[in-house]
Amino acid sequence: RAVIGMDGKQSEVGESNGRSGKSLVGELMRNIIPTAYIPGKRSDLFNDQFVWNDIQENTKLVFIDDVLQNFNFEFLFPNITGDWSVNYKGGRRITLPFARSPKMYIATNHAIRGSGSSYTDRQWLLAFSDFYNDTHKPVDDFGVLFFSEWDFEQWNLTWNLLANCVQLYLTYGVVQAPGERLEQRKLRQEMGETLISWADEYFSGEEHLNVRLPRKDLYDAFCQYDN
């Protein structure tokens, strides 16, 4: 499965919170294991036949950073659950068997589109709170920039943390993080702000609560609101 770091904070569709630490996790991995870094802001990301050019045979992780709202997760299905084919510039091509193919971490400010078991069975979702944000950064608490300004003691603490994580994984396996906030965020993105705004207003009166409402009346009311 792909691990997907998302903002847990509820916000309007299209609004990008960011600065919560999602990419910081990917940067940590870049510092400890062979990682292929891929910027996710490109709208034509998967039209590039050399998109996996930086993946080598010893690559352990592919970090796709800051993907767009319309990110095509389905494109990654074969890579997540099967062999990984890589086209290199210059004509060379290799296929990494599933057992040796890299894992995947995706950082995004938006909910990943798509539903059904084909999507959920290929995702581990992580919700990041807004404890860290534009005005409160890790450097404010720790006094140094992560990784580049760490001393031996900081790295030693990090390796101990990673060892504890491995120990917990070997003891309990993968523990799925609570996903209620992420599901709400995904539903909000699929519905759109106009529908949410209309529903909040339409159902604020008691005359529209706990009664049967003809579907056409609801549709007409929404169309009038949207105009």
Which residues does each predicted region cover?
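Feature primarily recognizes SF3-like P-loop helicase cores of small DNA viruses
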Residues: 1-227
